[in-house]
Amino acid sequence: MTNIRKTHPLMKILNNAFIDLPTPSNISSWWNFGSLLGLCLIMQILTGLFLAMHYTPDTSTAFSSVAHICRDVNYGWFIRYLHANGASMFFICLYAHIGRGLYYGSYMFQETWNIGVLLLLTVMATAFVGYVLPWGQMSFWGATVITNLLSAIPYIGTTLVEWIWGGFSVDKATLTRFFAFHFILPFIIMALATVHLLFLHETGSNNPTGIPSNMDMIPFHPYYTIKDILGALLLILTLLALTLFTPDLLGDPDNYTPANPLSTPAHIKPEWYFLFAYAILRSIPNKLGGVLALLLSILILIFIPMLQTSKQRSMMFRPFSQLLFWTLIADLLTLTWIGGQPVEHPYIIVGQLASILYFLLILVLMPAVGLIENKLLKW
């Protein structure tokens, strides 16, 4: 009798995705982040569900309801901090996953890559609307500043902003709709992630060499299931350490002050995972220009497959491209640091130079070096 996992209509899908899936024998720990992102998503949905049972999306009670969760609900403080720091872990995994894709040329699977970019945008939108919900000072002013950027759109900008706000400022209507978005988006992310996986399994995984590995595959289970479990344990350990020892390390103290439309915080800044984009936005002294640069800083990922000039897929055997890749990482870390600094000398000029370098590396230097490496290999 054939095993039920190979015949049952539902089990067959799971079997082909997680058990009998042929996988390259040489994929490194950088390939762990996909499963870790799945784990993060499940954790966020579960903790978020329990938080939503006690949260009230109303300007007069939102802040108090979060305080109530932390003080009065059984393990409410734990669920709340798991959810907040879980978002940080989510973005760490997300950026590592994208970095892996850039380094090893995984972006050559175009459908998978494009859905991945769409997933990134959806996760960023979810994190943004979620940050507004506690209704602290940074929640309110972050929402005001970021939604206001849409007013830079010619002709329809102002109307669009007021439509999103549901009034003439960020108020009760805004909070209610942001809660609705924050609740629905993770399920959209889940659906997109399934499609992401579907397209990946059409081609099979890439591997560190970038060379087709059809002749050297091993079953996903037990080899990569055990490897994924190790990654998951390390992720959970890190998340628990962060949550139980320094739960507010990555948060903003301003968000412990209830939202006050009459008092602007000295430094309005987003959570750490958006700082690089925020620095790019601020580095252009023009509203529309800044908004376009902000959008392009993320959407540039869509154009990466078109900018591939090297005849080798992976950077594994391309030392000059590796140098530029790590320069890009250093540049992004610089932008992240600048995004958290006040707008004054020398931070302004450093941010502008880092922003120029970011686009220069991706659009000009990396494709040029790819061509040079081809020449060096007489290809």
Curated annotation (Swiss-Prot):
It is a multi-pass membrane protein. It is found in: Mitochondrion inner membrane. PROSITE patterns: CYTB_CTER, CYTB_NTER. GO terms for cellular component: mitochondrial inner membrane; respiratory chain complex III. The chain crosses the membrane at residues 33-53, 77-98, 113-133, 178-198, 226-246, 288-308, 320-340, 347-367. The keyword Mitochondrion applies. Heme b b562 binds at H83, H182. A ubiquinone binds at H201. Keywords: Electron transport, Heme, Iron, Membrane, Metal-binding, Mitochondrion, Mitochondrion inner membrane, Respiratory chain, Transmembrane, Transmembrane helix, Transport, Ubiquinone. It comes from the Eukaryota. GO terms for molecular function: metal ion binding; ubiquinol-cytochrome-c reductase activity. GO terms for biological process: mitochondrial electron transport, ubiquinol to cytochrome c. Heme b b566 binds at H97, H196. Binds 2 heme b groups non-covalently. InterPro entries: Cyt_b/b6_C, Cyt_b/b6_C_sf, Cyt_b/b6_N, Cytb/b6-like_sf, Cytochrome_b, Cytochrome_b_C_euk/bac, Cytochrome_b_N_euk/bac, Di-haem_cyt_TM. Its main location: mitochondrion. Its cofactor is heme b. CDD domains: cytochrome_b_C (cd00290), Cytochrome_b_N (cd00284). Component of the ubiquinol-cytochrome c reductase complex (complex III or cytochrome b-c1 complex) that is part of the mitochondrial respiratory chain. The b-c1 complex mediates electron transfer from ubiquinol to cytochrome c. Contributes to the generation of a proton gradient across the mitochondrial membrane that is then used for ATP synthesis. Heme 1 (or BL or b562) is low-potential and absorbs at about 562 nm, and heme 2 (or BH or b566) is high-potential and absorbs at about 566 nm. The cytochrome bc1 complex contains 11 subunits: 3 respiratory subunits (MT-CYB, CYC1 and UQCRFS1), 2 core proteins (UQCRC1 and UQCRC2) and 6 low-molecular weight proteins (UQCRH/QCR6, UQCRB/QCR7, UQCRQ/QCR8, UQCR10/QCR9, UQCR11/QCR10 and a cleavage product of UQCRFS1). This cytochrome bc1 complex then forms a dimer. This is Cytochrome b.
